[in-house]
Amino acid sequence: MRKIEFFDTSLRDGEQTPGVIFSIAEKVTIAKQLEKWGISVIEAGFPAASPDSFEAVKQISKALKETAVTALARCVITDIDKAVEAVREAQHPQIHVFIATSPIHMKYKFKISPDEVLKTIDKCVRHAHEQVEVVEFSPEDATRTEPEFLLKAVQTAVDAGATYINIPDTVGYTTPEEYGKIFKMLIDNIKADREIIFSPHCHDDLGMAVANSLAAIKAGAGRVEGTVNGIGERAGNAAIEEIAVALHIRKDYYQAKSPLVLAETMATAELISQFSGIAIPKNKAVVGANAFAHESGIHQDGVLKNAETYEIISPELVGIKHNSLPLGKLSGRHAFTEKLTELNISYDAKELPNLFERFKRLADKKKEITDADIHALFTGETVKNLAGFILNNVQIDGHKALVELKNQDAEIYVSQGEGSGSVDAIFQAIDKVFNYQLKLISYSVDAVTNGIDAQATTVVSVENLATGTIFNAKGVDYDVLKGSAIAYMNANVLVQKENSQGKVEQISAHDGI
C-alpha cells in the first residue's frame, strides 16, 4: 500500500488568513508539534517576504530533526538565495519555487509570454537545484492553465532538476473529476530518469479542497499539501487532518495511507486554533466539538449498544481521551511534569518554574485542573510572552480601568481609561500607553475548558489605520477581563512592530500558490 507524504503549509499559506500572525516562538512550537504528528515536510515560510519570515524558517530549520523543512520562493534568483540561506541548517532541506502559468496570470499579472515563463522556470529551478538537492516546482493557477502548456512547464521543471511537482488549485476552481484527470495526464506523459512525485495543493473556495486532494491521491499523487484546520486565505486550504483520517478510514478505496500519528491530531488542531485565534467550528469534521456528539435518541441508543452504528471514527483515533490524571492545588511539580509528558507537551526546562507557578495560581482558582486547562495554560504562556510588553495588573472600578504594563526594558507604564463598560475602559487605558490609530474590528471570548471556572481565550481583531493591515491577537486567562487586556496589548505590540519596521509582509500576501 502506498504511503503518502504529508506537506504542511500552515505556517506559510495558513498565515495568509486575514489577521493571523504567528510569532517566531509560536511557529517553532507549532513546527515541533507537526513533527510529532508525523508531517513529512513543513513549509516554514517565505523568507524573502520579511526579516521575521526569514528568521522563522531559520529557527525551525535548526529545531527539527526528522521532518524536512522547505521554504517558498518566487521564480526570482534573489528569492531563491534567501530561501536557500534560511534552510541551510535543516537536517533535510528543500526549496519550493513557483511561477504562474495560466493565461490570465501571464497576461495581466506578469505581462510576459509563455516562452519567457518557460525560460524562467528552467533558469530558476536549475539555480535552486544547484544549491539544494530536493526542489519542488509549482505552476501557480495550474487548474486554469491550458493542458498543453502545463505539460511543457512541468517537463521544463523536471528537466531542470525538480523532484516534486505540485499542482495548485490556486483559486479553488477545479472539481475532483477534472483534477484527477490533470494528474493522470501529467503522470502518464512526463518523461524523467528518476522518480517524480506529484502533489495537490487545494483551496476551498467551492468547498471541494479535501475532495480534490483525495481525487489527486486516487489518480497517483504521492504527496499532499494542506493546512491544519484548513486555515488559509479566502475560504482556506485543504484540511490535513480530514485527508489523513479519510485515508485511514477508506484505505480500502484509496489503497494509500498517511504517515501521521493520528492520536496527535486533536492536540495539533487545538494548538493551531489557540495560536491563530480561530476557533474550531463545532460541526467541523474530525476535530469539531460535535464530531462525536449524538442528539437523536435513536442515534444515542445505537451508539450505546455499539459505537460503530453511528461512529465511523472513534474519538480515541484522533486523540480525544478521558482525563486520566486530574490535577489540583495539592499536586506537586512531579505530577505537573508527568502530566506534560502524558500530553506530549514540549517545553524548555528553563520555562518550567514559570509554568509551574502559573499552574499553582490556576489551581488556587479551580477545584480540578483538566487536560484542556493544561493545554490552555501552555499556549497562554506563549501568547503572554509576545515580545514587547507584559501585563502586570488590571483594576476595574465600574466604567473605569487602571492598567499597568511593563516593557522589555522593565519600564512600567500606568494608565487609566474610562469607557462604556469594563472592556472598553481597559482598551481606552491601553490606547493611552501606545497612542496608535487602531480600529477594533471584532472581539470574542471562547471558553477553552469546561465549567464555571473555565479558562478562556479572548481574541481581538484590529486594523492598523496607518497601513490597513489587520491583526488578530490573543489573551488566555481564567479572568476574562485580564485576558481581554492581554489580547489588546498584544494587538498594539503587533502594530508597534509594523510601524517601526515597515509593513510586515513586504511581498504581497497574494504572491503564493
Swiss-Prot record:
Its cofactor is Mn(2+). InterPro entries: 2-IPM_HCS-like, 2-isopropylmalate_synth_dimer, AIPM/Hcit_synth_CS, Aldolase_TIM, LeuA/HCS_post-cat, LeuA_allosteric_dom_sf, LeuA_bact_synth, PYR_CT. Its EC number is 2.3.3.13. It is an enzyme of class 2 (transferase). One of its GO terms (molecular function) is acetyl-CoA C-acetyltransferase activity. Mn(2+) binds at residues 13, 201, 203, 237. Keywords: Amino-acid biosynthesis, Branched-chain amino acid biosynthesis, Cytoplasm, Leucine biosynthesis, Manganese, Metal-binding, Transferase. Pathway: Amino-acid biosynthesis; L-leucine biosynthesis; L-leucine from 3-methyl-2-oxobutanoate: step 1/4. The keyword Membrane does not apply. Residues 4-266 form the Pyruvate carboxyltransferase domain. Residues 390-513 are annotated as: Regulatory domain. It comes from the Bacteria. Pfam families: HCS_D2 (PF22617), HMGL-like (PF00682), LeuA_dimer (PF08502). It catalyses: 3-methyl-2-oxobutanoate + acetyl-CoA + H2O = (2S)-2-isopropylmalate + CoA + H(+). It is found in: Cytoplasm. One of its GO terms (cellular component) is cytoplasm. Transmembrane segments: none annotated. GO terms for biological process: L-leucine biosynthetic process. CDD domains: DRE_TIM_IPMS. HAMAP family: LeuA_type1. Belongs to the alpha-IPM synthase/homocitrate synthase family. LeuA type 1 subfamily. Catalyzes the condensation of the acetyl group of acetyl-CoA with 3-methyl-2-oxobutanoate (2-ketoisovalerate) to form 3-carboxy-3-hydroxy-4-methylpentanoate (2-isopropylmalate). NCBIfam families: leuA_bact, PRK00915.1-3, PRK00915.1-5. Homodimer. This is 2-isopropylmalate synthase. The gene is leuA.
